[in-house]
Amino acid sequence: MTDTTQNPWEEDQAPDQAAAANHSHAAATSGEHAAAAGSSGTPAQTDPWAASSSAPAGNTPAPDNAADAWSNAPPPAASDVHQSAADWLNSTPTPTQEHFNLMDPFRHTLVPLDRWVTEGIDWLVLHFRPLFQGIRVPVDMILTSFQQLLTGLPAPVAILVFSLLAWQVSSFGMGVATLLSLVAIGAIGAWSQAMVTLALVLTALFFCVIIGLPLGIWLAHSDRAARIVRPLLDAMQTTPAFVYLIPIVMLFGIGNVPGVVVTIIFALPPIIRLTILGIRQVPADLVEAAQSFGASPRQMLFKVQLPLAMPTIMAGINQTLMLALSMVVIASMIAVGGLGQMVLRGIGRLDMGLASIGGVGIVILAIILDRLTQSLGRDARSRGNRHWYHHGPLGLLARPFIKSRA
């Protein structure tokens, strides 16, 4: 335990301290040499950046704010950023002017018919909407009457009445066929919808007869008016059924009454055309004979022309009835009820059973109406001297009274 006891860590730290001392001495020496060199006047060799400071005045670089245009610019305000973004989004591209190409003349629309039609319908709706709403009143009244009558009758009573009516206007076989057909409609569950469809069709037929017969009689006696109206009738018959729906919805709305209105417009041309044809086909010698006996124009019309033209007129009524039935089905797209609505709902739901019920009901109803109107169109001369009440169920009831009078 003498003073000669050594610290074992001193031997390890001595070399490190010596190395640190040598390093600091070398750094001091190099600093002195650098100072001496700087004072000796050789900056180009010791300071590599001195060349840039000793450059000619003409090659002096631009200031920092000129070299960097964004260094001193203030940051854009948030409102300016949003405004520029909005302007960019809302800006429309500048239209490029294209010259007319003779080899492709119809690349662009030349006649803006769609815009004209849209503006015309908007103008009609704006100025004449009360008029079109007033047209709904008589149509709604007649439709409501037919619908209440047909849907208010019990099904057995209605079937019996229709069967007797078919027997009266046609034959006993037609009465039986009508009976079986109506029973089939009720059996498949389409009776109420079939009565709604029948009410729509009868309402449209009623107005078509009221409008079409007088118009056809007038056009049959006026060649100038017939030449003016004939192109309109051609356009009405060739226009697709769906095209009628758009202006009717704009002017009248949706529902059963607009459906009847569009059906009237669609089914009107046949009765007008065939009324004109029937009256003009009356033999000229019969007309001359009536005139020679002093018949007045009214007597000529009701006693000669209309009775002889009745088969042709009834053919027009038959065509009008068939077109009305087809249009009532199409008009189900504007919320018209009946069998067409069943078909539309079945197609929309991919329910083929429901669509089939509506389709079968439409077919049966169309066959019944077609056969009945064809029977009404038979020439009165084919019945002989018998009156309409001398046959059918009314003939059975009136026969005892007729024999008693004889």
Curated annotation (Swiss-Prot):
Function recorded in the entry: Part of the OusB ABC transporter complex involved in glycine betaine and choline uptake. May also transport several other osmoprotectants such as ectoine, DMSA, DMSP, proline and carnitine. Probably responsible for the translocation of the substrate across the membrane.
Signal sequence extent: none
Entry-linked PROSITE patterns: ABC_TM1 (PS50928)
Keywords: Amino-acid transport, Cell inner membrane, Cell membrane, Membrane, Transmembrane, Transmembrane helix, Transport
Highest taxon in the source lineage: Bacteria
Family indicated by similarity: Belongs to the binding-protein-dependent transport system permease family.
Gene induction: Induced by increased medium osmolality. Repressed by glycine betaine.
Mutant phenotype after disruption: Uptake of glycine betaine and choline is completely abolished in the ousA-ousB double mutant.
Membrane-topology annotation of the record: Multi-pass membrane protein
A GO cellular component annotation in the UniProt record: ATP-binding cassette (ABC) transporter complex
Entry protein name: Glycine betaine/choline transport system permease protein OusW
Record's compositionally biased regions (Low complexity): 15-42
Subunit structure: The complex is composed of two ATP-binding proteins (OusV), two transmembrane proteins (OusW) and a solute-binding protein (OusX).
Domain ABC transmembrane type-1 span(s) in chain numbering: 194-373
GO process terms (BP): amino acid transport; choline transport; glycine betaine transport
GO MF entries: amine transmembrane transporter activity; carnitine transmembrane transporter activity
SUPFAM superfamilies in UniProt: MetI-like
